[in-house]
């Protein structure tokens, strides 16, 4: 059985989140959380929370053993972008895109 957890509109770009996500894909939940704990990227904390949420969903809603859970799917999709303007020389402006992402984790036993 597969159980899903999603976090939407994180304050990090999908490109940065995918660096953490690619490292833990296919690992056991406990092993993935341990790996993320020692990463220096601030996105690792967000990814870790989503994995813990998926494991808690499996344990509380479907009475699955959290020790047996494995990350079957994990991915980061692009979310909305905040568009801002930055002043430049000679009265011009250039756009700044503040990107965000949706993180989805699917665990299975």
From Swiss-Prot:
The entry's keywords: Ribonucleoprotein, Ribosomal protein, RNA-binding, rRNA-binding
GO molecular function terms listed in the Swiss-Prot or TrEMBL record: rRNA binding; structural constituent of ribosome
Keyword Ribonucleoprotein: yes
UniProt superkingdom: Bacteria
Record's keyword annotation contains rRNA processing: no
GO CC annotation, single: cytosolic large ribosomal subunit
Entries under InterPro entries matching the protein: Ribosomal_uL22, Ribosomal_uL22_bac/chlpt-type, Ribosomal_uL22_bac/org-type, Ribosomal_uL22_sf
Family matches, as CDD domains: Ribosomal_L22 (cd00336)
Protein's GO biological process: translation
Database matches in Pfam families: Ribosomal_L22
Disulphide connectivity of cysteines: none
Family affiliation: Belongs to the universal ribosomal protein uL22 family.
Subunit structure: Part of the 50S ribosomal subunit.
Function, in words: This protein binds specifically to 23S rRNA; its binding is stimulated by other ribosomal proteins, e.g. L4, L17, and L20. It is important during the early stages of 50S assembly. It makes multiple contacts with different domains of the 23S rRNA in the assembled 50S subunit and ribosome.
Protein name, UniProt field: Large ribosomal subunit protein uL22
Gene: rplV
């Amino acid at each position: 059985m597969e159980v899903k957890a999603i976090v939407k509109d994180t304050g990090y770009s999908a490109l940065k989140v995918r660096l953490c996500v690619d490292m833990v894909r296919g690992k056991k939940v406990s092993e993935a959380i341990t790996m993320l704990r020692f990463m220096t990227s601030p996105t690792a904390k967000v990814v870790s929370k989503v994995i813990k949420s998926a494991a808690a969903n499996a344990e509380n809603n479907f009475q699955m053993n959290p020790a047996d859970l494995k990350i079957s799917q994990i991915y980061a999709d692009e979310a909305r972008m905040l568009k801002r303007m930055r002043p430049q020389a000679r009265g011009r402006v250039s756009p700044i895109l503040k990107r965000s992402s949706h993180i989805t984790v699917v665990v299975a036993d």
